[in-house]
Amino acid sequence: ISALTDEKYFQGSFDFLPSVSRIAPQPILCKDFIIDPYQIYLARHYQADACLLMLSVLDDEQYRQLAAVAHSLKMGVLTEVSNEEELERAIALGAKVVGINNRDLRDLSIDLNRTRQLAPRLGHGVTVISESGINTYGQVRELSHFANGFLIGSALMSHQDLHAAVRRVLLGENKVCG
């Protein structure tokens, strides 16, 4: 489960991390623009189990430093890529869990083909997460051929009934007659 902690752009909060941790047994990902080791220490203090490191905002040395801090705290790292150059860097850096962001952060457009094109280039030992733009069960089913998991936010959070929204994305629209 990912929790937004960036306050400036996404109205997130580190306070979300322990709140989610109390009600969900799954590992909690701190989703933020992490650029400083302090943010990782803070995330761990607030009970995050993993952190997001975006190659679009980090150079290789920054990534190595931040990943080392996370690993020293027994935290997982989700390495985010959004294009071929970043994918090659993730491979060279030895990333074990790679998130492919289907959203172009420059214009916010969505292209699910990004997961279809980039995921096959990752090795068998790499866990692939498809991020952003996933709204339907059909998309989850089709992309599951390329990804081991999904980060789905807007499609769920825009609904009043979160439980029903999760069921729709995971199971589809199933009418039960009786």
For the regions a language model picked out, list residue spans one by one.
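N-terminal active-site wall of soluble small-molecule enzyme domains
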Residues: 2-78, 84-89, 115-118
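Conserved strand-to-helix beginnings and helix N-cap segments that scaffold or border functional pockets
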Residues: 13-14, 63-64, 111-112, 140, ...
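A generic structural signal for alpha->beta connector loops
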Residues: 25, 74, 94, 125, ...
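Catalytic-face loop-and-helix region of soluble metabolic enzyme cores
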Residues: 97-146
